[in-house]
Curated annotation (Swiss-Prot):
Record keyword Membrane present: yes
Keyword Membrane: yes
Stated name of the protein: Mitochondrial import inner membrane translocase subunit TIM22
Compartments, as annotated in UniProt: Mitochondrion inner membrane
Gene: TIM22
GO CC annotation terms, alphabetical: TIM22 mitochondrial import inner membrane insertion complex
Subunit structure: Component of the TIM22 complex, whose core is composed of TIM22 and TIM54, associated with the 70 kDa heterohexamer composed of TIM9 and TIM10 (or TIM8 and TIM13).
Membrane-crossing residue ranges in chain numbering: 47-67, 130-150, 151-171
Protein's organism: Yarrowia lipolytica (strain CLIB 122 / E 150) (Yeast)
Function: Essential core component of the TIM22 complex, a complex that mediates the import and insertion of multi-pass transmembrane proteins into the mitochondrial inner membrane. In the TIM22 complex, it constitutes the voltage-activated and signal-gated channel. Forms a twin-pore translocase that uses the membrane potential as external driving force in 2 voltage-dependent steps.
Amino acid sequence: MSAFGFPGGGAPTPPQGSFWDMTPEQQGMYSANLIMGTMQSCPGKSVMAGVTGFGLGGVFGLFMASMAYDAPVGMGVQTMSDLPFKQQMKIQFTDMGKRAWSSAKNFGFIGGVFSGTECCIESLRAKNDIWNGVAAGCLTGGGLAVKAGPQAALVGCAGFAAFSAAIDVYMRSDNKAPPSTDEDL
């Protein structure tokens, strides 16, 4: 992998002539290598994290909006129970859509920025350890909170870094060698 996760030689070259001159097995291997190279690059990882975060954020936003029993934000409604059922449903679905869209954008942005930052740091350091996630968390958290001032940026940096460290420690805890006997369990 070369600088910032871009594959060094670009796309793999077909072994002979064009793609359509290959056997089905060669086409499959060529396509698989092309997909794996894209997914292992920093832009590929960032896009995948952003798209996945967008989808999960949308589902999370729908769920959280459906659990909110208060009046929807910005609708000018004092009590929902005073409105007819059809209007209540219209307001609730509108609110669910707005909250889902907002959560989807936020989760997608955070996922893409964190993943891209972590991948770039990993490429620059040429190491895969816990400190890549901690540094990426700090940069992401601080960057997201920078508009609120330096104190908020510092708190965002510390919070995201701590959360990233906790997740990395948990995810890397299974990388131990298996026990030699059942008694070691």
